[in-house]
Amino acid sequence: MNRTLTDPMVSSFREDDPRPPVPGEEGETTCHHPSKLAMMRPKDPVKTIMADLRCSTARRDEDGLGEPEGSASPDSPLARWTKSLHFLLGDQDGAQLFRAYLEREKCVDTLDFWFACNGFRQMDLKDTKTHRVAKAIYKRYIENNSIVAKQLKPATKTFIRDNIKRQQIDSAMFDQAQMEIQTAMEENAYQMFLTSDIYLEYVRTGCENPSHVNPNGLGGLKLVCGYLPTLNEEEEWSCNDFKAKALATVVGLSAKTLRSPPLRAVEALEKGYRSYRRSDPGNPNRFTSGYSFAPATSANDSEVSSDALTDDSMSMTDSSVDAIPPYKLGSKKQLQREMQRNMRMNGQVSLPPFPRTRRPPKEMTPVEPAAFAAQLIARLERLKREQETMSSLEERLQQIQEEEERDESEMSSSSASHSLPLLPPGTCEEDPQAILDEHLSRVLKTPGCQSPGLLRHSPRSRSPEQRPLPRGGLSTRSQSSSMNGYVPAKTFISRQSTKHIHHHYIHHHAGPKSKEQIEVEATQRVQCLCHGTSECCTAPYIRSRSLGRDQCASPAEVALGHSSTLSKRLCKSGEEVNMEGLENSLLQLPADSTDRSQNVWQWILESDRQTKHKPHSTQNVKKSHSLEPTRTHTWGGGGSSGHLRAHQPAHPFVQDPAMPPLPPPNTLAQLEEARRRLEEVSKPSKQRHSTSSLQRDKSHPVPVQNGSSAFPMDERKDPKKMSGCHSSLGSETVVTYFFCGEEIPYRRMMKTHSLTLGHFKEQLRKKGNYRYFFKRASDEFECGAVFEEVWDDCTVLPMYEGKILGKVDRMD
C-alpha cells in the first residue's frame, strides 16, 4: 500500500490524491520529482534531490508494516552521495569524481585545503614536521590570495597568521577555516556537482555496473535521472535507448502520444531538457537559473498496461487528469501555469522535511544563564547611566534657565530705576546759570576741592571722564593773546571765538595715560577753578597739548580748561562773564547723590538739549562739521585723555534739527553697551590706546576758520600711509594681487602677521602652475620698489607700506 494513504496526517481520501501503485511495484516508494520542489524552493533544489533520494530509499518498516520482499539490500553509493558532502568525500570514487568536477571549474584548491586540514588534525604536535606543514598550508592556500583565502573571513585568517608567527601550533588551528570552506562547498560546488554532466554521466554508466545494481537500485536511478520514456506495448526498455541528457520533463499522455514510437518520446524529452538547461554558462548557480517540469498526476505511479479502452486507460488519456491538452503542447507559458496548478493540487503529498530557509535571529538562540545575566546587567547599567546623565543635564538646564530669568528680571528692574523721564519742554528755557551750576556740581564732586595745593588722588568722578576727548581750539587764536595771556576784565566772549572743533588724531609723542593720571589732571583743573582769582576768567581759552604741558601751564591757562559745557553755556548766553558769578557758582555747588549711570544719561540729554537751542549764527560752523564722519565715542581709551571735552554731538538728528528723530533706543541694548564700555575701561592702557587711536584715525581734520590748524605738520600724514600703518598694528593683513594680467586687482584681509607663500596659494580659487611676484622696497632703482619672485612655500611674503602687493602670472 502506498505510504501516502497510510500516513496519519492524510487520513481522508481526496480526489486529487495520487493513484495507488501498479500491482507488483509496491516496494518502490513514490516520491515527487525534485523539479517540483525546485519550483517551491528555487534556491536549494539539490537538497530537494537529496530528500527525494532519502524518500526513495525509505523502508516500509517506518510505518510498522515491515520490509517488502526483495528490498532488504543496502543503499547504493549514488544514493549516499546525495545525502551530504561527508558521504561524497568519504567514498573514494565520489571524492575522485568531485575532484574532477572541481578541476573543471578551477576551484580544486578548496577540496585540497579540506583534505589538508583533515591530515593536519591527525598529526602529532611533538613532531618537528607539524610546524612546517602548518606553515606550508598557510602559504599555499591562505597567504597568496587564492580562492581559499577569498572564502575565509578576515578574522580567521588573522588568527591563523598570529598562531604561525607565535609558533603556537594546535591541532584545531585550521578547524574554523575548514568549516568555512566546507560550508561554501556545500552551498555552491556540491549542489552544482549533483546536477553536472560528470555526475549524470557517471550515474548512467553506473547502471551497467553489477556492484551498483540491486532490486531497489533502478528506483533510485529513476529518481535521480528522471522519468523513463513511455514504452509501447510488447517492447522492452534498455539503458542504451535513454540518453544522459534526458532529464525530468512532462510529456502529454494523450492517446496520440501513447501510440507514438519511442523515438518521438525521446525527442520530446530532449526538447524539454534543452529548455531546462537554458541558462548563462558563466553563472555559478546554473542549476537554479532554469526551470523544470512538475510530474503529471497520472504519470507518478503507473505505466500504460494496454491500449484497450478501459477505465484505467481512459483516465490516462483524459486531458483533465494530465492537465495538458493536446493542442497546447507547444506553449511554454501554458505548461508553466499548468505545472504550478499541479503543484498546488499535489501540495498535500507527504514529503520529507527540508531545512528552514530562514534562521532564527541571534537573540533567540538559547544562552547560558550566567552569560545572559551578565549581558542583562551590563545593558541595565548602561541604561541607568544614560538616564542619570539625562536627568543631570535637565536639572542643569533648568538651573541655567532660572538664573537667566532672574538676571533678566534684575536687569529690567535696574533699567526701570535708571531710566530717566524726558525733560519737560519748560526746562529748555531755564536759566543758563542754573545749568552751569548743575554741571559743575557733577564735575567738581571730589574731595580734591578741599585742598587745592595738594595733588591728591581723588576718588573716581561721577562724570563720564573716560570718554575720548575731542580736540578743540579757538578760531581767533592770535600772537598777542598767546604772548600776553591776559585781556581786559570787561570783555565779551562770543560764540564764534569759543567754538570747539573736533580733531580725532593721535599724539604719537604722548604715551597712554593711566587712570590715576587722568584723575590727577581733572583734579588740577577743578582745583584751579576753585582757587582762581579775577584773572582766571579773563584769560582766553588756551589749550595744552599733553599732560606735561597741562601740568606746567599757568593758572590762567588751566583756569578755563574745564568741561566744554561751561564754554558752550558762556557762548550761548552771549553776555559778559564776571568772576563774581563764577565764584558764586563755585560756592553754591549742590550735592549730587545720583549714581554714575544716571549722570551719564542726564549728561547725554543735556548735550542734546543744548545743541537744539543754538542760534543761527553758528550754522556755518555746523556745515563744516557736517563734512566730518559722524561716530559715537567710546567710553574707554587713553592717549588723548588729557584733552578737554567739547560738546559736538555725534548723532545726525542733533546736527540737523530738521531731520526727523530716530526711534527711541532699547533700554536693554543701552545697558549692554554701557557694560561693554565699562569693561573696555578696565582693559590694559596699551590696548585702549591702540583701540582709541585706530578709531580716531578714521576721521579727517577740519580746518579752523582763520585757516590755521590746531596740530603740527608731523601729525598730518598721508591717509594711505596712515591706513597701512594702522592695518599692520591690527590682527589682519591686507593682501592685494593681480591675477594673470587682469586690470582689476583682488584685495583680501588675512588674519596673520607673517603670511607665507603656501598660505597665499591656499587662498587662490584657481589651482595651477603660476609664478608669484611680490612688491618690496628697494634702493636699486629710482622708483624705490621692485617685484621679487617667490618660489618656496615656506618663505614669508615681503610687505610694502604695510600691505602685501603681488602679481600671479601663468607659467609658460
Swiss-Prot record:
<keyword id="KW-0597">Phosphoprotein</keyword>
<dbReference type="GO" id="GO:0005886">
    <property type="term" value="C:plasma membrane"/>
</dbReference>
<dbReference type="InterPro" id="IPR016137">
    <property type="entry name" value="RGS"/>
</dbReference>
<dbReference type="InterPro" id="IPR024066">
    <property type="entry name" value="RGS_subdom1/3"/>
</dbReference>
<dbReference type="GO" id="GO:0007507">
    <property type="term" value="P:heart development"/>
</dbReference>
<feature type="domain" description="RGS">
    <location>
        <begin position="84"/>
        <end position="203"/>
    </location>
</feature>
<dbReference type="GO" id="GO:0031625">
    <property type="term" value="F:ubiquitin protein ligase binding"/>
</dbReference>
<feature type="region of interest" description="Disordered">
    <location>
        <begin position="609"/>
        <end position="726"/>
    </location>
</feature>
<dbReference type="InterPro" id="IPR036305">
    <property type="entry name" value="RGS_sf"/>
</dbReference>
<feature type="region of interest" description="Disordered">
    <location>
        <begin position="446"/>
        <end position="484"/>
    </location>
</feature>
<feature type="region of interest" description="Disordered">
    <location>
        <begin position="275"/>
        <end position="326"/>
    </location>
</feature>
<dbReference type="GO" id="GO:0070411">
    <property type="term" value="F:I-SMAD binding"/>
</dbReference>
<feature type="region of interest" description="Disordered">
    <location>
        <begin position="388"/>
        <end position="430"/>
    </location>
</feature>
<feature type="compositionally biased region" description="Low complexity">
    <location>
        <begin position="305"/>
        <end position="323"/>
    </location>
</feature>
<dbReference type="GO" id="GO:0019901">
    <property type="term" value="F:protein kinase binding"/>
</dbReference>
<keyword id="KW-0217">Developmental protein</keyword>
<feature type="domain" description="DIX">
    <location>
        <begin position="730"/>
        <end position="812"/>
    </location>
</feature>
<feature type="compositionally biased region" description="Low complexity">
    <location>
        <begin position="411"/>
        <end position="421"/>
    </location>
</feature>
<dbReference type="GO" id="GO:0005634">
    <property type="term" value="C:nucleus"/>
</dbReference>
<dbReference type="GO" id="GO:0048468">
    <property type="term" value="P:cell development"/>
</dbReference>
<dbReference type="Pfam" id="PF00778">
    <property type="entry name" value="DIX"/>
</dbReference>
<feature type="region of interest" description="Interaction with beta-catenin">
    <location>
        <begin position="415"/>
        <end position="467"/>
    </location>
</feature>
<feature type="region of interest" description="Interaction with GSK3B">
    <location>
        <begin position="329"/>
        <end position="415"/>
    </location>
</feature>
<dbReference type="GO" id="GO:0060090">
    <property type="term" value="F:molecular adaptor activity"/>
</dbReference>
<feature type="compositionally biased region" description="Acidic residues">
    <location>
        <begin position="401"/>
        <end position="410"/>
    </location>
</feature>
<dbReference type="InterPro" id="IPR032101">
    <property type="entry name" value="Axin_TNKS-bd"/>
</dbReference>
<dbReference type="GO" id="GO:0016055">
    <property type="term" value="P:Wnt signaling pathway"/>
</dbReference>
<dbReference type="GO" id="GO:0030877">
    <property type="term" value="C:beta-catenin destruction complex"/>
</dbReference>
<dbReference type="GO" id="GO:0032436">
    <property type="term" value="P:positive regulation of proteasomal ubiquitin-dependent protein catabolic process"/>
</dbReference>
<dbReference type="GO" id="GO:0008013">
    <property type="term" value="F:beta-catenin binding"/>
</dbReference>
<feature type="compositionally biased region" description="Polar residues">
    <location>
        <begin position="285"/>
        <end position="303"/>
    </location>
</feature>
<dbReference type="InterPro" id="IPR029071">
    <property type="entry name" value="Ubiquitin-like_domsf"/>
</dbReference>
<feature type="region of interest" description="Disordered">
    <location>
        <begin position="1"/>
        <end position="43"/>
    </location>
</feature>
<dbReference type="InterPro" id="IPR043581">
    <property type="entry name" value="Axin-like"/>
</dbReference>
<keyword id="KW-0963">Cytoplasm</keyword>
<comment type="function">
    <text>Component of the beta-catenin destruction complex required for regulating ctnnb1 levels through phosphorylation and ubiquitination, and modulating Wnt-signaling. Controls dorsoventral patterning by down-regulating ctnnb1 to inhibit the Wnt signaling pathway and ventralize embryos.</text>
</comment>
<dbReference type="Pfam" id="PF08833">
    <property type="entry name" value="Axin_b-cat_bind"/>
</dbReference>
<feature type="compositionally biased region" description="Basic and acidic residues">
    <location>
        <begin position="388"/>
        <end position="397"/>
    </location>
</feature>
<dbReference type="InterPro" id="IPR038207">
    <property type="entry name" value="DIX_dom_sf"/>
</dbReference>
<keyword id="KW-0013">ADP-ribosylation</keyword>
<keyword id="KW-0879">Wnt signaling pathway</keyword>
<keyword id="KW-0832">Ubl conjugation</keyword>
